[in-house]
Swiss-Prot record:
Homooctamer; tetramer of dimers. One of its GO terms (biological process) is pyridoxine biosynthetic process. This is Pyridoxine 5'-phosphate synthase. It catalyses: 3-amino-2-oxopropyl phosphate + 1-deoxy-D-xylulose 5-phosphate = pyridoxine 5'-phosphate + phosphate + 2 H2O + H(+). The lineage of its organism: Bacteria, Bacillati, Cyanobacteriota, Cyanophyceae, Synechococcales. 1-deoxy-D-xylulose 5-phosphate binds at residues 9-10, 45, 50, 100. It comes from the Bacteria. GO terms for cellular component: cytosol.
Amino acid sequence: MASLGVNIDHIANVREARKTFEPDPVKMVLLAELGGADGITVHLREDRRHIQDRDLNLLKETVHTRLNLEMAATEEMTSIALNLKPDMVTLVPEKREEVTTEGGLDVIKNKNKLKEIIQRLSGEDIPVSLFVDPVQAQLENCAEVKAAWIELHTGKYAITKNKARDLELSILKENTAKAKSYGLRVNAGHGLTYQNVEPIAAIEGIEELNIGHTIISRALSVGLSQAVKEMKSLIINPRKDNFLL
C-alpha cells in the first residue's frame, strides 16, 4: 500500500498572492497530518514564489511525519538542505517561467552534477530522490548516480484519457518494475487527482504518492483534514480500473 505525501505549496501560493501572513502553510500541516498524511512535501523554488525559507525552518520543527524537500540541483539549494536536514530531498528540474514542474530531470545530461550533489547529501544521511520521466535510460542513470529513490512523473498519465491513458499506465507499471530491479525505491506524483489516483496507487512497488493541488482544491469545500482523509481512503483501497472523468 502506498503512503501519501501532501504537498502544501498551494497554501503558500494563496499567502504570497497578497504578500501577507495568511494562510500559513506551517499551521496547516497539523490538519493535514490529522487527516492521515504520511508526509509533507514542499518545493523551495529559487524565485521563492510560494514556500519561503522561514517556512522550511518552522516545518522542520513542527512536522510530525516526514518532511520531503523538493528543490533544484543548485549549490544554493544544496547548502540549504545540508543545513536543514529534511527527511528526504527530491531533486526536480526548475524553470522560472513555468507555472509548475513540467517534466522530469534529465539525469543523463546532468549525470556528474547530480552524482556530486547526491554524494554530499547522502554523506549527511539525507536520502535523495530524483524526479524523472518513466523512461528506462533515465532510470538506469538514476541507479548509476547512486540515488536511493526516484519519483516517477505521472503528468502525462494525468492529462490523457481512454486508450492513451491505459498506455501511460502500462508505461508507469513497467518502469516501476524496472526501477525496482535496479535497486531503486519508487515514489510517484504530478497531476494526480481524486478521479485518477486509484490505478496509480494500485501499482505494485510504488511506495508513496505526492499530491498537492487537488487536495488543496478539495479542502476549500470540506476542510484540509477531510480532503486528506478522502484521498488517503482512495490510496488505501484502490480500484485498478477506476477512472472518474
